[in-house]
Regions:
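Rossmann-like AdoMet
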Residues: 1-30, 44
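S-adenosylmethionine/decaboxylated-SAM
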Residues: 24, 28-215
Length: 215
């Protein structure tokens, strides 16, 4: 696992086994410092069931899986949602996960998140931690956060990537001001990746039906 992560950061590229195309892992992939923070959040929360929106080149998924393995629960499972894996990314994210030996830990969904998340909710799935790095338009991020808030156990952690983007920060702001979520931590701000760790509400939603706070 660690050797695959170290190689990815050292080489910065990967050759797709599917079609031989060469892919630059960065800046699409998260930084080493964000990866470490993500892994530590998984460990700190003792997460067992995790979910990620946007597999991409798999750098974040590798760190999440590293955290799950460190937690040592045999029921650990990481769901990755990415409808573009076999097109834009040449299946490189899944390839790196296979090379790291964690394929059995990972469940890949090739549907768009706005389709997959309601289906998971309908089927009764539940998760302990989520990482959001998919569609960065406001409506996409908003839907991801709202559905994840229902899919995660109360008081769980959602880590949103690219918090520096207005669409992401505004969607997060709605959840903080209207849903009782708490901003637990943010990473160092830069123009490529800026993450925010959010804790969902712990109690029942007791808002009146007309409730709304400007965000």
């Amino acid at each position: 696992m660690r050797s695959v992560i170290d190689r990815a950061f050292r080489q910065g590229t990967v050759v797709s086994a599917a079609d031989g195309s060469v892919h630059s892992l960065f800046p699409v992939g998260i930084s080493a410092s964000e990866g470490e923070a993500l892994r530590e959040w998984v460990r700190r929360e003792r997460a067992v069931q995790t979910i990620e929106i946007g597999l991409g080149y798999g750098i974040s998924a590798l760190h999440i899986c590293e955290g799950l393995l460190a937690n040592g629960n045999p029921a650990a499972r990481h769901v990755v949602i990415d409808p573009n894996q076999d097109t834009r990314f040449g299946n490189c994210g899944l390839q790196l996960l296979q090379e790291a030996g964690v394929t059995a830990l990972v469940e890949h969904c090739a549907q768009a998140s706005q389709i997959a998340l309601p289906a998971y909710l309908s089927s009764g799935r539940s998760f302990d931690l989520a990482f959001v790095d998919g569609n960065h338009r406001f409506d996409g991020v908003f839907l991801d956060l709202i559905y994840l808030g229902r899919l995660l156990r109360p008081g769980a952690i959602i880590i949103a990537d690219d918090y520096q983007l207005p669409a992401v920060s505004r969607a997060v702001s709605f959840c903080l001001k209207n849903l009782g979520w708490v901003l637990e931590e943010t990473g160092a701000a830069d123009d490529q990746h800026h993450w925010a760790a959010l804790r969902t509400a712990t109690g029942e939603d007791a808002r009146p039906f007309y409730h709304f706070v400007e965000f």
